[in-house]
Amino acid sequence: MSLVIPEKFQHILRVLNTNIDGRRKIAFAITAIKGVGRRYAHVVLRKADIDLTKRAGELTEDEVERVITIMQNPRQYKIPDWFLNRQKDVKDGKYSQVLANGLDNKLREDLERLKKIRAHRGLRHFWGLRVRGQHTKTTGRRGRTVGVSKKK
Protein backbone atom coordinates (compact mmCIF):
# COMPACT_ATOMS: atom_id res chain seq x y z
CA MET A 1 0.00 0.00 0.00
CA SER A 2 1.25 3.46 -0.75
CA LEU A 3 2.45 5.71 2.03
CA VAL A 4 -0.20 8.34 1.34
CA ILE A 5 -3.74 7.27 2.21
CA PRO A 6 -6.46 8.78 -0.03
CA GLU A 7 -9.03 11.09 1.60
CA LYS A 8 -12.04 8.82 1.11
CA PHE A 9 -10.27 5.62 2.21
CA GLN A 10 -12.46 3.25 4.24
CA HIS A 11 -10.56 0.99 6.62
CA ILE A 12 -13.56 -1.29 7.18
CA LEU A 13 -16.39 -1.86 4.69
CA ARG A 14 -19.69 -3.46 5.66
CA VAL A 15 -20.90 -5.69 2.81
CA LEU A 16 -23.58 -8.39 3.14
CA ASN A 17 -23.40 -8.43 6.97
CA THR A 18 -19.63 -8.94 6.84
CA ASN A 19 -16.79 -6.62 7.82
CA ILE A 20 -14.23 -6.34 5.03
CA ASP A 21 -10.68 -5.12 5.66
CA GLY A 22 -10.17 -2.02 3.50
CA ARG A 23 -6.38 -2.38 3.49
CA ARG A 24 -6.41 -5.71 1.61
CA LYS A 25 -6.64 -5.95 -2.17
CA ILE A 26 -10.27 -6.17 -3.24
CA ALA A 27 -9.97 -9.60 -4.86
CA PHE A 28 -8.92 -11.15 -1.55
CA ALA A 29 -10.83 -8.82 0.76
CA ILE A 30 -14.27 -9.93 -0.48
CA THR A 31 -13.38 -13.58 0.21
CA ALA A 32 -14.19 -12.71 3.83
CA ILE A 33 -17.85 -12.99 2.80
CA LYS A 34 -19.11 -16.51 3.37
CA GLY A 35 -19.82 -18.18 0.02
CA VAL A 36 -17.26 -16.11 -1.92
CA GLY A 37 -13.96 -17.77 -2.78
CA ARG A 38 -10.96 -16.45 -4.67
CA ARG A 39 -12.15 -17.66 -8.08
CA TYR A 40 -15.67 -16.27 -7.64
CA ALA A 41 -14.24 -12.97 -6.38
CA HIS A 42 -12.03 -12.63 -9.48
CA VAL A 43 -14.92 -13.40 -11.84
CA VAL A 44 -17.23 -10.90 -10.11
CA LEU A 45 -14.60 -8.14 -10.19
CA ARG A 46 -13.91 -8.74 -13.88
CA LYS A 47 -17.65 -8.51 -14.64
CA ALA A 48 -17.86 -5.32 -12.54
CA ASP A 49 -14.89 -3.89 -14.46
CA ILE A 50 -12.87 -3.16 -11.31
CA ASP A 51 -9.06 -3.23 -11.12
CA LEU A 52 -7.98 -6.34 -9.18
CA THR A 53 -4.98 -4.57 -7.64
CA LYS A 54 -7.13 -1.86 -6.05
CA ARG A 55 -7.49 -1.85 -2.26
CA ALA A 56 -10.97 -2.50 -0.87
CA GLY A 57 -11.02 0.84 0.95
CA GLU A 58 -10.42 2.75 -2.30
CA LEU A 59 -13.69 1.61 -3.93
CA THR A 60 -16.44 4.14 -4.49
CA GLU A 61 -20.01 3.53 -3.32
CA ASP A 62 -21.05 2.91 -6.94
CA GLU A 63 -18.38 0.22 -7.39
CA VAL A 64 -19.35 -1.50 -4.14
CA GLU A 65 -23.00 -1.56 -5.23
CA ARG A 66 -22.00 -3.03 -8.61
CA VAL A 67 -20.01 -5.80 -6.92
CA ILE A 68 -22.90 -6.63 -4.58
CA THR A 69 -25.48 -6.80 -7.38
CA ILE A 70 -23.25 -9.07 -9.49
CA MET A 71 -22.57 -11.35 -6.50
CA GLN A 72 -26.27 -11.65 -5.72
CA ASN A 73 -27.46 -12.05 -9.35
CA PRO A 74 -24.67 -13.92 -11.15
CA ARG A 75 -26.86 -15.47 -13.87
CA GLN A 76 -27.95 -12.03 -15.10
CA TYR A 77 -24.29 -11.18 -15.69
CA LYS A 78 -23.61 -14.40 -17.65
CA ILE A 79 -21.63 -16.24 -14.96
CA PRO A 80 -22.04 -19.92 -15.92
CA ASP A 81 -24.25 -22.28 -13.88
CA TRP A 82 -21.39 -24.65 -13.10
CA PHE A 83 -19.60 -21.81 -11.30
CA LEU A 84 -22.35 -21.32 -8.71
CA ASN A 85 -22.42 -22.92 -5.27
CA ARG A 86 -26.11 -23.89 -5.25
CA GLN A 87 -27.00 -25.93 -8.33
CA LYS A 88 -30.43 -27.44 -8.98
CA ASP A 89 -31.88 -26.51 -5.59
CA VAL A 90 -33.95 -29.37 -4.15
CA LYS A 91 -37.03 -27.20 -3.55
CA ASP A 92 -37.25 -25.04 -6.68
CA GLY A 93 -34.58 -26.48 -9.02
CA LYS A 94 -32.90 -23.10 -9.52
CA TYR A 95 -29.21 -22.27 -9.83
CA SER A 96 -27.91 -19.56 -7.50
CA GLN A 97 -24.94 -18.29 -5.53
CA VAL A 98 -25.81 -18.38 -1.84
CA LEU A 99 -23.92 -15.84 0.28
CA ALA A 100 -23.42 -14.89 3.94
CA ASN A 101 -26.40 -15.74 6.20
CA GLY A 102 -28.27 -17.42 3.35
CA LEU A 103 -25.53 -20.06 3.14
CA ASP A 104 -25.97 -20.99 6.81
CA ASN A 105 -29.75 -21.13 6.40
CA LYS A 106 -29.59 -23.36 3.30
CA LEU A 107 -27.14 -25.74 4.99
CA ARG A 108 -29.38 -25.99 8.06
CA GLU A 109 -32.45 -26.59 5.85
CA ASP A 110 -30.62 -29.34 3.93
CA LEU A 111 -29.62 -31.12 7.14
CA GLU A 112 -33.15 -30.80 8.56
CA ARG A 113 -34.56 -32.27 5.34
CA LEU A 114 -32.14 -35.21 5.49
CA LYS A 115 -33.07 -35.86 9.13
CA LYS A 116 -36.79 -35.56 8.39
CA ILE A 117 -36.74 -38.12 5.57
CA ARG A 118 -34.56 -40.40 7.76
CA ALA A 119 -31.78 -40.60 5.17
CA HIS A 120 -28.56 -42.31 6.24
CA ARG A 121 -26.62 -39.02 6.05
CA GLY A 122 -29.27 -37.28 8.13
CA LEU A 123 -29.17 -39.96 10.80
CA ARG A 124 -25.36 -39.82 11.01
CA HIS A 125 -25.59 -36.04 11.45
CA PHE A 126 -28.25 -36.52 14.12
CA TRP A 127 -26.13 -39.04 16.03
CA GLY A 128 -23.03 -36.86 15.75
CA LEU A 129 -21.04 -39.50 13.86
CA ARG A 130 -18.85 -39.25 10.76
CA VAL A 131 -20.95 -38.91 7.63
CA ARG A 132 -18.65 -39.58 4.70
CA GLY A 133 -17.72 -43.22 5.20
CA GLN A 134 -14.70 -42.80 7.47
CA HIS A 135 -13.77 -45.58 9.87
CA THR A 136 -14.81 -44.88 13.45
CA LYS A 137 -13.48 -47.86 15.39
CA THR A 138 -10.50 -46.03 16.86
CA THR A 139 -10.66 -42.37 15.80
CA GLY A 140 -13.28 -39.73 16.47
CA ARG A 141 -13.93 -40.81 20.04
CA ARG A 142 -15.36 -38.26 22.40
CA GLY A 143 -15.93 -38.08 26.12
CA ARG A 144 -13.75 -39.13 29.02
CA THR A 145 -11.18 -41.88 28.67
CA VAL A 146 -11.93 -45.04 30.58
CA GLY A 147 -8.87 -46.29 32.43
CA VAL A 148 -8.01 -49.95 32.95
CA SER A 149 -8.17 -51.20 36.54
CA LYS A 150 -5.17 -53.23 37.71
CA LYS A 151 -5.61 -56.87 38.80
CA LYS A 152 -4.91 -57.64 42.46
UniProtKB/Swiss-Prot annotation:
Q: State the Gene Ontology BP annotations.
A: cytoplasmic translation; translation
Q: Name one GO molecular function term.
A: rRNA binding
| Pfam families in alphabetical order | Ribosomal_S13
Predominant location: cytoplasm
Modified residue annotations for N6-acetyllysine: 94, 106
Protein location? Cytoplasm
Role this protein plays: Component of the small ribosomal subunit. The ribosome is a large ribonucleoprotein complex responsible for the synthesis of proteins in the cell.
| Family per similarity comment | Belongs to the universal ribosomal protein uS13 family.
Q: What is this protein called?
A: Small ribosomal subunit protein uS13
Q: Tell me the organism.
A: Homo sapiens (Human)
Q: What is the lineage of its organism?
A: Eukaryota, Metazoa, Chordata, Craniata, Vertebrata
